[in-house]
Amino acid sequence: CAFNIYGENESTEWFSSEMGTMPRYKTPRKKIFLRYYEAGQKGELLLIEEFTGKACVAHYEYLCTLPVMGKALKQMIADGGSFPEQQIDHAAYFKYGYLLFITLEPCPQAHDIFKRFAKVFEQTFTRFLDLQKSEAQTREAQIEASLERVRTQAMAMHKSDDLLNISKVLYEELKML
């Protein structure tokens, strides 16, 4: 499974399997990733892409050329693993990207579940973005408050020796940030 978040010119993907989670990596808008992106932009809810035989081999050869993912796949082979002879990718779309479910057999009974997971993930990711925005606003408010304390000290300066007090306030405010 993976989730893929759209960026301006490429996307960021987080992938996990029975072997664990890989670090996030960038996916270019090329080949299969372009097809996934375009389907999402057209408003698809679920795209199913089947790879068998030579097409599956070519798919994994391409994935091996990508930074991070390629390294992990090559390590899997070096550790005695192998690529599947066939797989079915299910891209379930949400506002910010898609969830990718990979199966080895058709699973039409799971299609509605994949779509439901995408909707819940959209809610979760929206909450994540809201929290990021709130944290940034809080940080900006802290910076503004610190600047105001330094300004207040500067405005209270009556003689040149008071510059030392301002420098102390500045130091303390920077430490707090």
Describe these PLM feature segments.
Residues 1, 26, 114, 143, ...:
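Active-site-proximal structural scaffolding
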Residues 2-59:
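GAF sensory/regulatory domain recognition
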Residues 99-107, 150-156:
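Glycine- and acidic
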Residues 105-126:
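Amphipathic alpha-helical "output/dimerization" segments
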Residues 42, 46, 123-134, 163, ...:
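Intrinsically disordered or highly flexible coil/loop and linker segments, enriched in small
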Residues 1, 5, 154-162, 167-177:
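Short regulatory alpha-helical segment in sensory/regulatory domains of signaling proteins that mediates
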Residues 56-98, 106:
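Helix-to-coil/beta transition segments that act as allosteric "coupling" elements at the rims
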Residues 127-157, 165:
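Signal-transmission linkers at sensory-effector interfaces
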